[in-house]
Structure formats: structure tokens, C-alpha cells
Amino acid sequence: MKKIEYKAKAAVENLLFKCAGGMAGQSLMLVHEDRDDGFYDADLHEVIAENAKELGFFVQFYPIAFDPDVRMMPYDLVCASASADHTIFVARLGDQIRFCADIPDATWIIVYAIDVDMLVSNFGRADYAGFDAVKTEINRFLIAADHIHVTCPAGSNFSGHAKDLEAETNDVTIKRFPISIFTPLPTMYFEGRIAQNGFLIGTGSKYYKPYSCGLQKTLFIEFSGHHITGFHGDDADITAAKNHYQFVADTYGIDPFFIHSWHAGIHPACAFNAPAPASFERWSGAAFGNPRLLHFHTCGEYPPGEISLNIVDPTVSVDGVKIWEAGVLHPERLPAGTKLLAEFPSLKQAFDHPAKNIGLGEAGRLSII
């Protein structure tokens, strides 16, 4: 068996057995976009299907047209999925409705590996159960913390806590594969400054145009609780940012300066090898799982909002313990981290050999060009 074929099979085993909890003999519906839509690798759903069949699953395809402004779950899709044991989204629709409460009582999974290279890398092959355990451990540690302090080389500096907010945290109702973030923390008890380089960009909820807003210099966004309270930096950038926020808010009838929640990446094998401007939509939908990125949901009083802010190489200190340090996640600094690394060898391999590429420009920062 060729090496790439072996890796693809291992990744699909991880998806179907570890993530979906499936077994041979069950049925699988693959929801996919048209081949020429360009977001997902055109062959990705076929690679998954081929390996799923070899693993003993019955596979059916459900092609779906991309809707940039989807409002609800398509009824025909809900009906079709009822006949399958597992529904796998190789389509942006899964990301767009990931916080929807009306998900059927079935296994629905959104694939965040957007091409075959991502799928067969350690991103797709590292044990799903191991990253699920890391996510749970991080969630527990963050929710219990008295003080969380975040900085970055560009000048971000904010702090606060999420105690007593466990019931307020909003996680997706569709499973992610791979698991690449912890449950987003509400900003209710946080305040400070976010340093944004390069651009403002959409969250994958709705695909408006223009999807990004270029910044020439570092823009500082001040916030307190759930509200953006000010912009500081180059005058042209401030004007552009305010106008972009207002444009998106007016388009959807939402609060422009509401800031909902934040999270950082937890999967060190998540890589984005092209510069972000090569496809802002693909970058926004795929790169965020790398620990070098910390991501805010803003513009709209709901997760994930419509505009994301992205911090590069964060240091996240939790009650004095630097769980993320200069963009490197240290699971061994979590209470149960060393045990998890020993229990899941592929987890340790991923953390020992982290992917560095996250779509930065030539200057080593996010860039509009």
C-alpha cells in the first residue's frame, strides 16, 4: 500500500471510528459542495468515501450548492440524513450551522481538513480521543481559573476570568473533526486590548462581500466585557475598521461592536501553507486550530458572530501557568497533561513536531497582501 493511501485510511479510521463512534456495516452520508466551488479539495469527499467503503461502511453522496447566507438547516437535508447512521460535512454548510440548536439526534460531523494533505497529515491522523481529552482538560482548567492573562508580540493585553460562566459557554452542536479548539470563553468578565494585524475577516457564519477588510498597520481594539469600546492606531485603519463593522452589522441587522467570545487553537498539526490572502475564506475556515492563533468572535450577539479578530503567537497565562507561550501550547503544564501525552502517543508526536505555517506574510505577521 502506498504511504499516502495508508495515511488516508488511518485518517478515515480516526474520523469514522474515533470521532463518529461508527462500526462496519453502518451507513454514511457525505454532504459535499460542487467540485468547482474551490473551498474544499475537489477530491476530498471521494478519498473519504473510498476509504469508508474499504472499512465496511455503506456510503451515499449528498451534493449541495453553497449558500453564502444560509439561515436554517435545509429541510431536504434533514430528511435525507435520517436514513444514514452518520452524516459527514465536506461542505461549508456544516460550519455555517455549527451552532444551530435544531440538529437532528444523529451523528453529524464537520470536517475541518479542507484538502487531502491536511487529512493525511498528523492533523487528521492524531488520535481524536486524545485531542478530545485535551480539550476537556483545557476547558476544566480555564473555567476554574481565577485569572487568565493574554499577551502577544504585537501588543495584545487582556485579562479576566470565566468562572461561573460554564452554563454560558457555547459549543458547536455538530462534532468537529479534527478537534482543534477548546470551548469558546465568553468575554463577559474580560477586558483589555487586542492587537490586530493584516485584516479583519469573516467567521464562516455568513459569506458577505467584501469578506475581509485590509489594515496597513497594527490596529488596537479595546474592549470591556461584551463590548468593543474603542479603536486605536492609524487613522485610515480606524476608519476602515469602523466602516466594515457597520457594513456587516447593517447587512444582517446586528450589533456591530458586540464581542461574544474567544478561543485559541489546540491542534499543533493544523497547518495553512499558503499566505492567507491566497484565499481569505479558506484561511478563516481552516487555520484557526493552530495554537499560534487566538480568535475572537465579534459583530453580533451570537456565536460565532460575523467578524473575527486574530492574534498571532499568544501567551495565555492561567493562574500564573503559561499554558500557551509565544504560540506554543504546552499540554504538559495542565494538571493531567503528562498523563494524556503518555496515554496517546500520536498526541505527543503532534506536540513534539508542531506545524509552523499559519498563512503569515513575508514580514512574519498577518498581511492583506
Label for each model-derived stretch:
Residues Y208-D250:
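Long, well-ordered mid-to-C-terminal structural blocks that present hydrophobic/aromatic surfaces
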Residues Y75-A91, A240-I254, P277-N290:
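A short, hydrophobic/aromatic-rich structural module that often spans a beta strand
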Residues N197-F199, S224-I228, G233-A236, G265-A269, ...:
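Histidine- and/or cysteine-centered catalytic micro-motif in compact active-site loops
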Residues A287, R292-P304, L309-K348:
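Mixed-charge (polyampholyte) low-complexity IDRs
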Residues G253-I307, I311-D313, K356-I369:
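Cysteine/selenocysteine-centered motifs that mediate thiol-based redox chemistry or coordinate metal-sulfur cofactors
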Residues K206-Y207, G233-D234, N273-A276, E306-L309, ...:
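Short conserved micro-motifs at the rims of enzyme active sites and ligand-binding pockets
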Residues R193-A195, F220-E222, G230, H263, ...:
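Structured core elements
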Residues M1-T218, S224, D255, V321-G327, ...:
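Active-site bordering "gate/hinge" segments
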